[in-house]
Amino acid sequence: MANCEGTDGDGSGCNGWFLVQAIVDKQTGDTVSEDEDENATDTGSDLADFIDDTTDICVQAERETAQVLYNMQEAQRDAQSVRALKRKYGGSNLNKSPCAKPPGVHREQRVTLQELPVNICNKQARTNVYSVPDSGYGNMEVETAEVEVTVVNNTNGEEEGENGGENGGSIREECSSVDSAIDSENQDPQSPTAQLKTVLQANNQKAILLSQFKHTYGLAFNDLVRTFKSDKTICTDWVAAICGVNPTIAEGFKTLIQPYALYTHIQCLDTKYGVYILLLIRYKCGKNRITVGKGLSKLLHVPESCMLIEPPKLRSPVAALYWYRTGMSNISEVSGTTPEWIQRLTVIQHGIDDSVFDLSDMVQWAFDNDVTEDSDIAYGYALLADSNSNAAAFLKSNCQAKYVRDCATMCRHYKRAQKKQMTMAQWIRFRCDKCDDGGDWRPIVQFLRYQGVEFITFLCAFKEFLKGTPKKNCIVIQGPPNTGKSYFCMSLMHFLQGTVISYVNSTSHFWLEPLADAKVAMLDDATGTCWSYFDTYMRNALDGNPISLDRKHRHLIQIKCPPILITSNTNPVEENRWPYLTSRLTVFTFPNAFPFDQNRNPVYTINNKNWKSFFQKTWCKLDLQQDEDEGDNDGNTIPTFKCVTGENTRTL
């Protein structure tokens, strides 16, 4: 016979059948006991207490009792700690809270809460407790009382019969003792919190803070700072005076501020308002007054109304000396690198150098950097104040505008005299020294050949042009529009630093005044009217002979007209209207349009580097080598200009 599924066989293993034999002692006809009911149904209720679980229930009850007692004690301690902390750090804002009530109301509420029974579970009473307004700082006693009542209600449970009265009594006694201590502190007018409340309630808080700062530190706060009218002005260095700081927080503040700053100088002195902190800080990035105030308020738990925040004085030796001297004393905690403005104002040599301004040093700087405009001189020299003591003294002076005008005037005088003493060859050499190397002369020659100009012919005319030979003192580049006439001539003027005159100013008597200080001049796009003016008034100028110039607010001056380069769409030689200009002009024609590549870049690049290479290549052809043997001991054809006293170089 096959085995049944899921079994190990009949009578084998643990799944087999077993026989149960019941032994019945009672037989039919025996007398039934009185405490037995024959008609009763067997419900199994007689087995309810079959297992003895009294031991487990007792153990569980003991554990719950201990846990409830522990929770109650912890809640007591937490409530006392919260009350003490709120009293310390939040008491100053109690009266300023919009939800705060007069002190009498709080005392009445505290009395009412103390009179409540500990086992209170009335919904109406609990609603009254929760309805007390809170601003976040005030009403600390009400909050703690509410916490204690709730804890007792949750923890008493079944045990309030025996221990409820004792626990409730102890809680009420502790609450009463703490509240009485708080009331006594509130009533003490000499406590730091009460003193700080007077500051917060004052009409002019800043005046009280300034007065207390001077009384504490012995100097005025404004002696160390300069005023920023806007709260949004950004600065990296700030000075802050914080009043009413808790001593414990003030001690930890020295460590908490380190991640935000590159330099800190902290002083802490005790006052009747609490700890008064004086802080000089350099942040890692620029911040405005609002950001600084929020950051310090978060670290110190002090409202921003108890702070004075301004940037330090960066040019006051007295302020810098105060930070320097107090930084070496034991009342200050200093960390980081000392700011450069403190070092500059406290080092003796720097103080001596900064006190004297030398105009010649400023003129020498402007001359060496070829700066002659007033605005450029003022801005450029002011940027050197961090590294140049004379520039720092210039910024301290009240006569900056006068110094700038005098410097620009003297620099122009020196530049004009230097240019006047140079020959054309020296001037070209001087301009070549100002340019970088790496140019190529070939694009210039290729462009002339592209326009059909013979290079040798142009070179001969250009040599006479640079020498200022009479009747050869003017070169005209004429041709159709867009042939590169202005591009070619303007690049040459830029390299030689020539002067450009415009016929649009011809109605003025002074439109030719720039020719007085020029080595080379240019007039762009001369029209028929302009050629008529030249034919009438400027024949001597085109000849290269001396002419008389009228200058504004000055006497007439007699000069030899510099070489003039003119561009025009009209060929004056072919016109019969100006027969007297034919012998005075050397004309080159550019007939072809200027070429560009596919990217609209010039095919022939003409710049300062290429012109330098061109002059170096054709130096002998242009007959410019006559001044090479003339020079100073250093081999320079141009003497070095110095308007300051030289310094002896110390040899090692």
UniProtKB/Swiss-Prot annotation:
Family matches, as Gene3D superfamilies: 3.40.1310.10, P-loop containing nucleotide triphosphate hydrolases, Zinc finger, large T-antigen D1 domain
Keywords associated with the record: ATP-binding, DNA replication, DNA-binding, Early protein, Helicase, Host nucleus, Hydrolase, Isomerase, Isopeptide bond, Nucleotide-binding, Phosphoprotein, Ubl conjugation
Phosphoserine: modified positions: 92
InterPro entries according to UniProt: Helicase_SF3_DNA-vir (IPR014015), P-loop_NTPase (IPR027417), PPV_DNA_helicase_E1_C (IPR001177), PPV_DNA_helicase_E1_N (IPR014000), PPV_E1_DBD (IPR046832), PPV_E1_DBD_sf (IPR046935), Rep_E1_papillomaV (IPR016393), Znf_lg_T-Ag_D1_dom_sf (IPR037102)
Enzyme class: isomerase
Intracellular or extracellular location(s): Host nucleus
Post-translational modification: Phosphorylated. Sumoylated.
Pfam families xref list: PPV_E1_C (PF00519), PPV_E1_DBD (PF20450), PPV_E1_N (PF00524)
Domain SF3 helicase: 453-603
EC number(s) on file: 5.6.2.4
Annotated segments matching region DNA-binding region: 188-354
GO cellular component: host cell nucleus
Ligand binding (ATP): 479-486
Region (Disordered): 153-173
UniProt crosslink position (Glycyl lysine isopeptide (Lys-Gly) (interchain with G-Cter in SUMO)): 560
Subunit structure: Can form hexamers. Interacts with E2 protein; this interaction increases E1 DNA binding specificity. Interacts with host DNA polymerase subunit POLA2. Interacts with host single stranded DNA-binding protein RPA1. Interacts with host TOP1; this interaction stimulates the enzymatic activity of TOP1.
Role according to the record: ATP-dependent DNA 3'-5' helicase required for initiation of viral DNA replication. It forms a complex with the viral E2 protein. The E1-E2 complex binds to the replication origin which contains binding sites for both proteins. During the initial step, a dimer of E1 interacts with a dimer of protein E2 leading to a complex that binds the viral origin of replication with high specificity. Then, a second dimer of E1 displaces the E2 dimer in an ATP-dependent manner to form the E1 tetramer.
Entry similarity comment: Belongs to the papillomaviridae E1 protein family.
Protein name stated in the entry: Replication protein E1
Organism the protein comes from: Human papillomavirus type 70
Organism lineage: Viruses, Monodnaviria, Shotokuvirae, Cossaviricota, Papovaviricetes
